């Protein structure tokens, strides 16, 4: 799947980590995803801002674009994130995943057991960018 240039933001080049950012709910809240995308871009990442797409599309874009990291806006829908994780695994996509937004405590524990780094509301942008560097090996 070809990603239009207007959705590719940040630095580019072979040594730059690529991050796919997607929403998992129709909650209408875009501020968090936009702020995190900008922080990652300013932190030196190439960001593919995909918006609201299906689990299958997330897996396809992640594979086609050879992303180094996948970021998901949870919106309180942990079962959707788990479906995305299952789809990524089935499609052999091994990029690490981080999730932000409204994540109930019990859900964060479930996701973290599956290797997802969780960032609830109020997490600092510095912590998110630092974690992205650690997860991609671009520290």
Report residues per predicted region.
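Cofactor-cradling patches in redox/metallo enzymes
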Residues: 33, 37-118, 122-124
């Amino acid at each position: 799947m070809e990603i239009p240039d207007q959705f590719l933001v940040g630095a580019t080049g072979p040594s730059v980590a690529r991050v796919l950012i997607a929403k998992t709910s129709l909650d209408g809240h875009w501020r968090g995803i936009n702020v995190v995308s900008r922080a990652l871009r300013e932190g030196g990442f190439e960001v593919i801002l995909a918006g609201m797409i299906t689990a299958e599309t997330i897996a396809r874009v992640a594979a086609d674009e050879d992303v180094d990291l996948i970021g998901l806006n949870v919106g309180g829908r942990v079962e959707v994130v788990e479906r995305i994780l299952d789809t990524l695994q089935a499609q052999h996509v091994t990029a690490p995943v981080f999730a932000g937004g409204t994540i109930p405590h019990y859900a964060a524990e479930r996701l973290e057991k599956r290797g997802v780094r969780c960032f609830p509301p109020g997490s600092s942008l510095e912590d998110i960018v630092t974690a992205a560097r650690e997860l991609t090996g671009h520290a």
